């Protein structure tokens, strides 16, 4: 069986290096190992079943799902949010014609090549991105650590592929970090309004994560202002002017 790391074997990160007395972030490009490629393949095969188990719905109450090959109505929903981002970028005078993989009609973005968009975003983390199989671990492994144990697994997949003898954190602790357990729980106190932003170039995680949170909230009748700012990375400036307008509107 061929292995192509789901078409994206290379990843680039920005580790901090101390140069004289100034800390600079220097880009480093690497290629995933064969083993990481197999893990990527296995996780990709598992993901559609997870998405489909959430039973997410769009604005017209259509169920959003993924097919085994990663296509489907859930991906199409995310694509529509990306097109909204492109439309706003055009209004903000971005030269969107420089991207040959975007389709236009009367100078308006109407579609794009999904794989080219993924290439444009690039991969930042090797697989698995969060629950590592061994040392040195990830910040997330350490979040789930204890007073005695630095790193603990928080997924069955990470635990099954463990190389460092890390234990698996109890399920009740994992639950505390997952808002999906509480959004539909009538006993949980939720904010009345949410504003969620995920940059089009935010590679720290997938756009699927913010999309899942948005849809889960909306499916439980909680208003969400969701947008994907173009040309924006992780912790970017998500337009504070719009933020203050949103606050004003929900507090009137």
Predicted segments with their positions:
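Accessory cap/linker subdomain of secreted extracellular hydrolases
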Residues: 2-185
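Extracellular/periplasmic catalytic domains that process cell-envelope and extracellular macromolecules
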Residues: 187-190
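Catalytic histidine neighborhood in serine/cysteine hydrolases
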Residues: 192, 218-234
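Short beta-strand/loop motif that positions the catalytic acidic residue
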Residues: 195-198
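Acidic catalytic loop of the alpha/beta-hydrolase fold
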Residues: 200-205
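Short, highly selective alpha-helical patches that border small-molecule cofactor pockets
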Residues: 206, 210-214
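Short N-terminal edge-element motif at the start of the domain
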Residues: 208, 238-239
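Catalytic active-site module of serine/aspartate enzymes centered on a nucleophile-bearing elbow/loop
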Residues: 239-252
């Amino acid at each position: 069986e061929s292995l192509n790391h789901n078409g994206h074997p290379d990843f680039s990160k920005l580790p901090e290096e101390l140069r004289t007395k100034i800390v600079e972030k220097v880009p480093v490009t690497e290629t995933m190992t064969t083993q990481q490629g197999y893990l990527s393949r296995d996780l990709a095969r598992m993901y559609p079943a997870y998405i489909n188990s959430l039973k997410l719905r769009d604005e017209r109450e259509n169920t959003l799902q993924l097919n085994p090959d990663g296509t489907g109505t859930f991906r199409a929903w995310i694509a529509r949010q990306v097109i909204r981002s492109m439309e706003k970028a055009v209004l903000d005078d971005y030269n969107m014609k420089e991207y040959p993989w975007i389709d236009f009609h009367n100078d308006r973005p109407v579609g794009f090549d999904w794989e080219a968009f993924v290439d444009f975003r690039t991969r930042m983390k090797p697989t698995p991105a969060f629950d590592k199989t061994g040392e040195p671990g990830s910040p997330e492994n350490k979040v789930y650590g204890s007073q005695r144990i630095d790193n603990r697994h928080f997924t069955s997949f990470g635990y099954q592929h463990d190389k460092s003898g890390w234990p698996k954190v109890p399920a009740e602790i994992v639950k505390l970090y997952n808002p999906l357990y509480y959004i539909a729980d009538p006993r949980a106190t939720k904010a009345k309004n949410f504003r969620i932003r995920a940059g089009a170039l935010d590679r720290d995680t997938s756009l699927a994560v913010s999309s899942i949170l948005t849809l889960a909230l909306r499916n439980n009748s909680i208003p969400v202002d969701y947008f994907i700012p173009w040309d924006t990375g992780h912790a970017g400036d998500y337009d504070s002017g719009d933020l203050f307008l949103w606050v004003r509107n929900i507090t009137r």
